[in-house]
A protein has these predicted regions:
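Long, well-ordered, tryptophan-enriched scaffold segments
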Residues: 1, 7-8, 12-32, 37
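Single conserved hydrophobic/aromatic residue that forms the stacking wall/gate
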Residues: 1-6, 11, 251-260
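Short, small/polar residue-rich loop motifs at catalytic or cofactor-binding pockets
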Residues: 19, 130-133, 194-196
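Internal maturation/activation junctions in enzymes
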Residues: 53-152, 164-165, 172
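Alpha-helical support elements that line or immediately flank enzyme active sites
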Residues: 214-235
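Active-site rim segments in enzyme catalytic domains, especially the processed small/beta chain
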Residues: 144-209, 233, 237-238
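Glycine-rich phosphate/pyrophosphate-binding beta-alpha loops
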Residues: 36-41, 149-159, 213-219
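Compact, glycine/acidic-enriched structural inserts
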Residues: 237-252
Length: 260
């Protein structure tokens, strides 16, 4: 189908699925687990690593301080997202360093508790190197859970339907970088950075809850806000989802737009 409109993609560029181990960060008495890069779930883990230094529960949930720390933690995490997140098969990503307690504290210390910073930069490491998403979660009486998310990107994806097959091809290749020095630069057989991130919360080594949401770069921000709503403010899942939230929309190449 895509060859009919002049695409250079061929069968060698086909998708290959793989099993991966989730990456987890401790928060209060639970663990937040996300998929590793090439997705943005890592940003939620970085936000948690930063926010665990804030002791948010000492403020009411709607206190401006809580919104301030959430917004600044997101900005810090997304600076690293734009610099480092890519397909780990093609780039050396400092995953351990990005999630270390020392680095989380270092990034937290950059936050001015009284004012938003004009700008942040990504961390430096000495190493070389729109409504289009559906989320589904299900659990059974035995505690088995599935956390599933899918998206064609850009609403109708590529707009191309393989003849006779009845589904739309996605176009997430848009999220490759065109900068040849960037770890997420496009390359044959390479997976682009993407935003779709199913999540789990673990407790004592066992799954406690599967969850996720839609909304591009809102997703890691939403994961973190669900986590603090439940485990800093004692909300149940319904209350955590209904609560007010902050979101700062970020594109790798476009200005940031923040909303509450």
């Amino acid at each position: 189908a895509i060859g009919l409109v002049g695409s250079e993609m061929c069968i060698r560029d086909r998708h290959t699925s793989e099993w991966v181990d989730p990456v987890c960060v401790d928060y209060r008495e639970v663990q937040l687990c996300e998929l590793p890069p090439n997705g943005q779930g890592f940003a939620a883990l970085q936000m948690v690593s930063i926010l665990k230094n804030a002791n948010l529960a000492k403020w009411k949930r709607d206190d401006p301080k809580v919104w301030h720390f959430l917004t600044e933690a997101k900005r810090l995490a997304f600076e690293d997202l734009a610099r480092y997140y890519a397909d780990p098969a093609f780039a050396n990503i400092p995953t351990k360093e990005l999630l270390s307690e020392e680095y989380g504290k270092k990034r937290f210390d950059l936050i001015n508790p009284e004012n938003a910073m004009a700008s942040f930069g990504p961390g430096e490491f000495s190493f070389t190197s729109e409504g289009d998403t559906t989320y589904l979660t299900v659990a059974d009486s035995n505690g088995m859970m599935v956390s599933l998310i899918q998206s064609n990107y850009r609403g109708m994806g590529s707009g191309l339907v393989p003849d006779g097959l009845g589904f739309m091809l996605q176009d997430r290749g848009e999220l490759f970088s065109m900068d040849p020095s960037h770890p997420n630069v496009y390359a044959p057989g390479k997976r682009p950075f993407h935003t779709i991130i199913p999540a789990f919360i673990m407790q004592n080594g066992l799954p406690l809850m599967s969850f996720g949401l839609m909304g591009g770069s809102m997703q890691p921000q939403g994961h973190v806000q669900i986590l603090i709503n439940m485990f800093d403010y004692g909300m149940n899942p319904q209350e955590a989802g209904d609560a007010a939230r902050t979101v700062s929309y970020t594109h790798l190449t476009l200005p940031t737009n923040s909303n509450v």
